[in-house]
Amino acid sequence: MIIDRIRLINFLSHEDSEIFFDTGVNIIVGHNGAGKSSIIDAIRFALFGDKRTKKIEDMIRKGAKSLEVEMEFRHGGHTYIIRRSITRRSKNPESNAMIMVDGSALSQSVKDANDYIEKNIITKSKDVFLNSVFSKQGEMDDLISGDPARRKKLLDEILEIEKLEETYDVLKDVIDSLQAGISNLDYLISENERDRDDLRRYQDDVAELSKQIDQEEAIESDLLRKKEEASAEYNAVSKELIMLDATLKNMMSLSDEANRYEEEIRKIDGKLQEISGSTERYNEITSSKVYASRERIRGYWTDKGQIIDYRKMLKNIDGQVQSYEDNMKKAAELQADHDQYEIMQRRMDEIKHELDDLRTYESKYVSLINEIEQKKKKREEYRKKQKDLGDEISRTLGRAFANASELVAIYEEIRRDIDEINTDLGNLQVKIGALRQKEEEIRRNMNMLEGHNKCPVCGTDLGDEGSRRIREHYSEDLNRLNEEIDHLEREASAIDEKKRQLISMESYLAKGKIREYETYDRQMKDLEAQITDDENSLSTIAYKHTKYEQLDEEYRSMHLEDLRQKYTDWNNAMAVISNIGDIEALRKQKDEVSKKLKDAEDRTHEIESEFPDINSYTPSYIGKIEDEVRLLEPQIKLAEDLKRQRETLREKVKDLRSRSAGMDEIQKRKNELSVKASESETRLKYVEGQIQATLSSLSGKRSKVETLRSHVSEIEQRISDRERDIERMKKIEKAINDVKRIREAFGKNGVPAMIRQSVSDYLTAKTRDYLSSFDLDFDDISVDQDFNVTVYRGGVPEGIDSLSGGEKTAVAFAIRVAVAQFLNADLSLLILDEPTAFLDEERRNSLSDIIEYTLKDSSVIPQVIIISHHRELLASANVAIEVKKIGGRSVVSNAD
């Protein structure tokens, strides 16, 4: 992995910092608290989303709502861009992530980004990657400290060997837990032996009871056969008795039914005698001549009424014919006046229709005349108000303007001047703040120098002369800073006064003066356009106004009063003629009515000759005899129904008497069978008693067998369950032995020792390779399994404490690079955080030389990023970057 670029937006103290890296050595310098380590934090955040603060949102710069980190790097022949962001929310912060590969987006969520990095970029565990790439502050010093135990602990942590030793202790807990699970194995085996003895005893009892059950089941079978025979005999006798009893009951029922029918016949004869008088009266009426001719007599009275109606109709028709002829004559006399009236009326209707069509235009014409006059007056009012407002604005601003556009331009110019002044003031305040911060830092460093001769930044011993020179330098810087601050504050005060004047004018205009002036301008233009439109509209309808006045004059000059009455008389005459309709049809109707009158008179004469006393046979008389017949008809129908019922009942009595003969013989046979049925029932009950006793005995034995078999099943289940537990525990017992052997492998002399030996050999070889390029005063070096470092001078082994400061630094650096390459064979990036911490000047200079002559060669490690507050290292850098704190924010620039 080679990092090309990283950008920090609102990340910790960085507002917007972009850092470009290259292969070789990249050194980032700056004072403590300047924001150097934030760049390493940003790299870890980009790769893993790691945070160094308690809450992830605390990494957002104070006053900002969100942060963003974007890192571009190369890996495996591809170019990657990782972008992560955090946004403050009311409850939980919102995190987002995105990965692009060669310009194409691959993931759009935090989870997808983390999964992709783990599987395709890091490939190893996160801890291994971090331990190989990142060297924490103080590690270089720990690797060369005089305490072997401390050095061993540090390398164990980097190589994660302590996790293997933790596994040794964990496996002890696993073994103890497994041992607890098999503590009752012997008890389970003894319990199974005791249950097997009980099982054999219960099985013998079941066999004996089964033999007794077989014997009693044979007895039960014989008794069931006897019961079946007795039951068959009893059922046959009972069945015949039931049939005989049913036959007797049926015969008695038939005899009773015949008696009831004979009683009903006697009742019918009585009813027929009661209605004989009604029958005789019915026959008398229906056989008379008047009843037979009742419809003709009723028609006679109808004809008498129609004769009167026909005579009235003939008189009415004669009157209509005379009216028709009179009105035809009157209409002919008024025809000429009628035609003249219609001609004049049509012309008036035409004029009225045209006036209706033109009335809208006439109204619009009059309305436009009035509106044009009103709008001209309003336009003059707006012109006067705008002039008064313009004079007021000019006096306030102290400058004239010709129109609204010029006024807006003046307002925008004032706002731009205010923005420029604000920018100038902000820049001045930033400069003043930076100078005051620098002043405070100088005073703090001067206070730290009082009574001490050590560098307040790195703790280097300066001596008396060095301390004096630094104090003099600090005093000169303070005087220069105070003069510069005074000058900047005077400049800010003058600019601020100009700002107040501009804000006063801007505030005056912002209260709506521009909008009011523009409104008058717009209103006058709108009115001018409206007046023009109205005048154009007026010219287009002027000819319609002229035509309207001409037609109105013509309409008012026309008079129809003299002709209107004659026109009305003609219409009335024609209405009478129209109501009468076809005169020829009316005359034909007269002939038809005359014929109907003659036919009716002929029919009445015929009836009167046949019935001389016809006046006695009025319609009410005919209705009366018809009503009497209708009243008698139900009695006649009842007599007929009763006669039919009587004949039917006589036939039924005859049939029932025939079917109920022979009852005595059947009763005798029934008595004989009753005795036989009683004997069969006694035998059947005896056999059933014996069967019940046998079944009771069998039920008890079978219940006992089921109980015994249930005990057998329970015992077999217990034995089976224990066998499974015993088998499982034996497997656990075997597993315990296997785990014990595995635990031994994780012990001090097992896998950790093998790893330490492997690491020891690798570190020794790699350290020799790196140190061979240095001109050091010893022959060889070795790192043993406990990570003790031994050097050889002339073949004589010596401890690391025998080395000089520079030699220790070279050894520590070589071991750290070797450890990184052991963890990551493809190591292309190494990040060192404050490697000079706790190093004296000699060892810092040695480290600078090592970096220049070793790491600048990109064949060892292609890219190295170093964070330090010691500028001495810049001489060995391919890329030099400086971080400063200005106005509370970190600023990144190229180092001088």
From Swiss-Prot:
Coiled coil as UniProt keyword: yes
SUPFAM superfamilies referenced in this protein's UniProt entry, alphabetically: P-loop containing nucleoside triphosphate hydrolases (SSF52540), Rad50 coiled-coil Zn hook (SSF75712)
Coiled coil: 200-274, 412-505, 580-611, 636-669, 702-731
InterPro entries from the UniProt entry: P-loop_NTPase (IPR027417), Rad50_ATPase_archaeal (IPR022982), RecF/RecN/SMC_N (IPR003395), Zn_hook_RAD50 (IPR013134)
Cofactors named for this entry: Zn(2+)
Pfam families reported in the protein's UniProt record: Rad50_zn_hook (PF04423), SMC_N (PF02463)
Residues engaged in binding ATP: N32, G33, A34, G35, K36, S37, S38, Q137
Segments forming domain Zinc-hook: 411-507
Metal-binding listed as a keyword: yes
An MF annotation (GO) of this entry: ATP hydrolysis activity
Any Gene Ontology biological process: double-strand break repair
Record's cofactor remark: Binds 1 zinc ion per homodimer.
Alphabetical list of PROSITE patterns matching this protein: ZN_HOOK (PS51131)
Keywords, sorted A to Z: ATP-binding, Coiled coil, DNA damage, DNA repair, Hydrolase, Metal-binding, Nucleotide-binding, Zinc
Residue sites binding Zn(2+) per the record: C455, C458
Family the UniProt entry places it in: Belongs to the SMC family. RAD50 subfamily.
NCBIfam families (UniProt xref): PRK01156.1 (NF002244)
Function: Part of the Rad50/Mre11 complex, which is involved in the early steps of DNA double-strand break (DSB) repair. The complex may facilitate opening of the processed DNA ends to aid in the recruitment of HerA and NurA. Rad50 controls the balance between DNA end bridging and DNA resection via ATP-dependent structural rearrangements of the Rad50/Mre11 complex.
PANTHER family: ABC TRANSPORTER ABCH.3
Record remark on domains: The two conserved Cys that bind zinc constitute the zinc-hook, which separates the large intramolecular coiled coil regions. The 2 Cys residues coordinate one molecule of zinc with the help of the 2 Cys residues of the zinc-hook of another Rad50 molecule, thereby forming a V-shaped homodimer.
Quaternary organization: Homodimer. Forms a heterotetramer composed of two Mre11 subunits and two Rad50 subunits.
The protein, known as: DNA double-strand break repair Rad50 ATPase
Organism whose genome encodes this protein: Thermoplasma acidophilum (strain ATCC 25905 / DSM 1728 / JCM 9062 / NBRC 15155 / AMRC-C165)
Gene name of the encoded protein: rad50
